[in-house]
Every structure is written in structure tokens, then in C-alpha cells.
Curated annotation (Swiss-Prot):
It is found in: Cytoplasm; Nucleus; Preautophagosomal structure. One of its GO terms (cellular component) is phagophore assembly site. Cysteine protease that plays a key role in cytoplasm to vacuole transport (Cvt) and autophagy by mediating both proteolytic activation and delipidation of ATG8. Required for selective autophagic degradation of the nucleus (nucleophagy) as well as for mitophagy which contributes to regulate mitochondrial quantity and quality by eliminating the mitochondria to a basal level to fulfill cellular energy requirements and preventing excess ROS production. The protease activity is required for proteolytic activation of ATG8: cleaves the C-terminal amino acid of ATG8 to reveal a C-terminal glycine. The active site is at C228 (nucleophile), D393, H395. Its EC number is 3.4.22.-. Pfam families: Peptidase_C54. InterPro entries: Papain-like_cys_pep_sf (IPR038765), Peptidase_C54 (IPR005078), Peptidase_C54_cat (IPR046792). Its main location: cytoplasm. This is Probable cysteine protease ATG4. Belongs to the peptidase C54 family. Transmembrane segments: none annotated. The keyword Nucleus applies. It catalyses: [protein]-C-terminal L-amino acid-glycyl-phosphatidylethanolamide + H2O = [protein]-C-terminal L-amino acid-glycine + a 1,2-diacyl-sn-glycero-3-phosphoethanolamine.
Length: 500
């Protein structure tokens, strides 16, 4: 070990003794070699990792966002025994527009209202497509990792070239899986200008610096290679809207108008409030993220905050008083509210004590999914069977989704590009520990059920609910919470595996 470390130091000394240009070229060659190796591993993984099949003889239940399916399941799946009533078709998430928001009232606001997402402007000075977090909200401090996702994009493109097979899976499960909205890389959209900040180029991954050095220097017309966490976050948010408005039993064969209205909000156009352009603009203003730079779970969560969303802070701790101030501010009207838990469940891999609790988050009736992932990529996880988690992979470039003034003008082909029946799965042991977990709370009964469910899990709970936020002076938090925190320095962040 000593000689190896010494050799490493000698190599570094040799590099430092060369001219800056030669040193830079050597570092680039080493990084390029590592990327070629990564691509090779992905190709082999694609060959040896075919579409998953179901063991019919075992007939183990398979879950999709809180619904359980067996081979003889006929229609919508079986939710857990204790569930709340299905929301009415007109139920919506509502947007919060905080005072610090900048911008002018414009088309994105009207598009949001037309889609049934009313905007509360009673205390607002201005409306932004994705406003800055309200004063008093705490910045999330979840370690994030820069991206290297060319290999993931290549692997995913191969996987989705052919239509999915049934693989022995319950047809009702496949119908449910296919009905979830799937946001992917897009190409050919309106250019997102490059940042003029001299630090912007250094913030890009090596892959993106190499890629953009031979391309258009004016900006980005595709998010391939850097936007997968944004797309995973869009998927989570779009499905929260869909379930809130249409109910959990919605399938593609029922009421496509609702889907068109929601898809319109995520078009690859600045006029769409939750477009890639507006995510990037908000990331630059609120999170210090440059165009072309990878977004982590925390930055993505902050960009989603324009809806009525409760965000946890650097601990996986949900405070009831804070939640109620968002969901039921006047004490009389409970609004459907999305809880986003941005957390890290280990250093390089998920600690095994959290495996069962993590899988159970996809079995709760309030489940909206997990945005996060696997080494070298970010996915949107929506299902589970045993120790395997099913996901929608955003690393599949497709033509830009256009903005339609009239959502009814979306074609079947454009809607089809937001869905897939092809299954991909990953063992829980192979998941990256940094993630964003979503839950949709429809009413107070739902809230009470969710609190009980996240507390009584097998293994160690990953979410804790406390009555009061200690920073409000109304309590002292949960005893022992500080002992469970894993302190990580900035240097540790560079070793995390949540690459794009």
C-alpha cells in the first residue's frame, strides 16, 4: 500500500512539473480513458441485462406507486388495506408564489391556471414561472455528485429501441406502469444560452466540456448528458399532478384531455412553467447552477417549490407544524400537498438497514416515487418486487416536446413519447444513496395514515415526523436525531456516485 501511494505521489509530482498545457492534456486523456471504459461496461451490461421477467410460479406481488398486482389482478391493483378515498377528478395541487419571486405575470401563469393548478397571488408582488423559495425556507444540504452520463444515455437508448414484452408480468401492472408520465432527454429545443460567468465552464463535467468544445458555442439545444435529474424531477412532479387531478386509477385509455393539459406544462419551451428552460433559469437564480451543469436532488427539489410543496431540510425530518402551514394555512381547507424528502442513506451505497423502509415508500398509497438513482445516472423509481425496484429512465433522447397554446392539439405520437411499457429494474443494493422521495397527501386522513405508515416499517425508518420545528421555539426535535447524521465534507461530495 505504501509503494502504491508513493507511486501516485510521484505521478502527481511529474504532472505538476510539466507545462500547464501538457498537464491538462494528460488529465484529459486519463478522464477520456475512464469514460471509454465506462461506456464499454454499459454495453456489456446491456447485453447481459435483458428486460426483466416475472416468475409466474412464485407469483410474488409487484407494486406500482402504492398498488399491488398479482397475475390474476384484473384492473387497477390492490392498494394497502388502510387507504383514504380517491380524490375527486377536479382535485389539484396549488401553487405558492412567495414574495421574493421575480418576474412578470405572463403566459406560464395562464397555462398553469388552464391546467387546473390555481395560483395564489394574495401576498405576491410578482409571478415567476418557477419562483424563488419563500423567505424562511431553508436550503437543502444533500451531497450531490457531478455527472458523466453519456454511457447511461447510450445504454438507455439501446434498451428502449424495441417495444417492451409482457415478460410474464400482470397486464394490469403493465397498464399502470405505462400510464405514468415519463420525461426524458430532449433534443432540438430553443437554445438555453451559456453562462458568461468564467466559472461556468469549470462547473461542467469533463464529458460535457469535451462535447461542447466541438459543438455550438452559443448554448444548449439538448439536455443530453446533464439533464437527467431535472427530467426525473419533472416525472415525479407530473405524476403528482396527474394523480391529484385524475385519481390513482387513471389509465391512458381514460380522459386523455387531463394528460394533455399536464404535458403542456412540461413542454420544452420557456412558455411552459415547468420546462427544462425554466428549471435551468431557476437553478441559476436560486441554486447557483449553470446551464449545462448537473442538477442534484436538492436543486431539483427547490425548482419544484412553485407548487404547494413541503420540503424537508438536511435531515429526513418532517415537522407537522411546518407541513400544516403549507397544506392547511387557514385551518379550514386542506390542500393536496406534495412532500419531498431529499436525503442520503449512506456514503457510497445505501446502508442495508434502510433497504426495507426504502422499498416500502413505493408501497404506500401516498407514493409518488423516487428521483435519484444508480451509479452514473438518475432515474425515476415507481415500482418494486422483492428487492428489485422498477424505474423510468430519462436517458433516452427524443425530439423536443413542443408547446401548444391549445393542449388538445397534442398528437398521439407526442403523448406516446411520454410513456413506455418497457420495464427496467435495479436491485436496491445497487442504488445510489442520494435521492428525492415524493409523497402526495390529499387530505388530513391521508396525512394521519402516512405519519403512521412511515413510522411503522421494517428495518430503520428513513423519515421521522415530529410535532414542532425546534427552530420555531416550540420543541426540541426528536431525541437522538443528531446522532444519526452522517457529517460529510465538500471533499466527500466528489466521491458520491450520483452521476448523470
Amino acid at each position: 500500500m505504501k509503494s502504491t501511494r508513493s507511486g501516485s505521489n510521484n505521478w502527481q509530482s511529474a504532472v505538476s512539473g510539466t507545462s500547464p498545457k501538457i498537464a491538462t492534456a494528460m488529465e484529459a486523456a486519463i478522464s477520456a480513458g475512464a469514460e471509454v471504459s465506462r461506456v464499454g461496461r454499459r454495453i456489456l451490461q446491456r447485453i447481459w441485462d435483458p428486460e426483466p421477467t416475472n416468475d409466474r410460479s412464485n407469483n410474488e406481488p409487484v407494486w406500482c406507486l402504492g398498488c399491488s398486482y398479482l397475475l390474476d389482478t384484473k384492473e387497477y391493483g390492490t392498494p394497502p388495506t388502510l387507504t383514504t378515498s380517491t380524490p375527486p377528478a377536479d382535485a389539484t395541487l396549488t401553487a405558492i408564489v412567495p414574495e421574493p419571486g421575480a418576474g412578470v405575470e405572463s403566459e406560464p401563469r395562464r397555462a398553469t391556471e388552464k391546467a387546473g393548478v390555481p395560483v395564489n397571488t394574495s401576498n405576491a408582488k410578482a409571478v415567476a414561472p418557477i419562483p424563488v423559495a419563500a423567505s424562511g425556507q431553508h436550503q437543502l444540504q444533500v451531497p450531490e455528485t457531478p455527472p458523466l452520463s453519456v454511457a447511461s444515455s447510450f445504454d438507455s437508448a439501446l434498451a428502449y429501441e424495441e417495444p417492451g414484452q409482457d415478460g410474464g408480468w400482470p397486464p394490469a401492472f403493465l397498464d399502470d406502469f405505462e400510464s405514468r408520465i415519463w420525461m426524458t432527454y430532449r433534443t432540438g429545443f430553443e437554445v438555453i444560452p451559456r453562462s458568461t460567468d468564467p466559472k461556468a465552464a469549470a462547473a461542467l463535467s469533463f464529458t460535457m466540456r469535451f462535447k461542447t468544445s466541438f459543438g455550438d458555442q452559443t448554448g444548449f439545444s439538448s439536455d443530453t448528458g446533464w439533464g437527467c435529474m431535472i427530467r426525473s424531477g419533472q416525472s415525479l412532479l407530473a405524476n403528482a399532478m396527474l394523480i391529484s387531478r385524475a385519481g390513482r386509477a387513471w389509465r391512458r385509455t381514460t380522459n386523455p384531455d387531463i394528460e394533455r393539459e399536464i404535458v403542456c406544462l412540461f413542454a420544452d419551451d420557456p412558455r411552459a412553467p415547468y420546462s427544462i428552460q425554466n428549471f435551468v433559469n431557476h437553478g441559476a437564480a436560486a441554486c447557483g447552477k449553470y446551464p449545462g451543469e448537473w442538477f442534484g436532488p436538492s436543486a431539483t427539489a427547490r425548482c419544484i417549490h412553485s407548487l404547494r410543496v413541503y420540503l424537508t431540510r438536511d435531515l429526513p425530518e418532517v415537522y407537522e407544524d411546518n407541513f400544516m402551514s403549507t397544506a392547511n394555512p387557514d385551518g379550514n381547507h386542506f390542500h393536496p400537498t406534495l412532500i419531498l424528502v431529499s436525503t442520503r442513506l449512506g456514503i457510497d451505497k445505501i446502508n442495508p438497514i434502510y433497504h426495507e423502509a426504502l422499498i416500502s415508500t413505493l408501497q404506500l398509497p401516498q407514493a409518488i416515487g423516487i428521483a435519484g438513482g444508480r451509479p452514473s445516472s438518475s432515474h425515476y423509481f415507481i415500482g418494486a418486487q422483492g428487492q428489485w425496484l422498477f424505474y423510468l429512465d430519462p436517458h433516452h433522447p427524443r425530439p423536443a416536446l413542443p408547446y401548444r397554446e391549445n393542449p388538445n392539439d397534442y398528437t398521439i405520437e407526442e403523448l406516446d413519447s411520454c410513456h413506455t411499457r418497457r420495464l427496467r429494474h435495479l436491485h436496491v443494493e445497487d442504488m445510489d444513496p442520494s435521492m428525492l422521495i415524493g409523497f402526495l397527501i390529499k387530505d388530513e386522513d391521508d396525512w394521519d395514515l402516512w405519519k403512521s405508515s412511515v413510522k411503522h416499517v421494517q428495518g430503520k425508518a428513513i423519515i421521522n415526523v415530529s410535532p414542532h420545528d425546534p427552530e420555531h421555539g416550540m420543541g426540541f426535535g426528536r431525541a437522538g436525531a443528531i446522532d444519526e447524521v452522517e457529517t460529510l465534507s465538500d471533499e466527500d461530495d466528489t466521491d458520491t456516485v450520483l452521476d448523470l
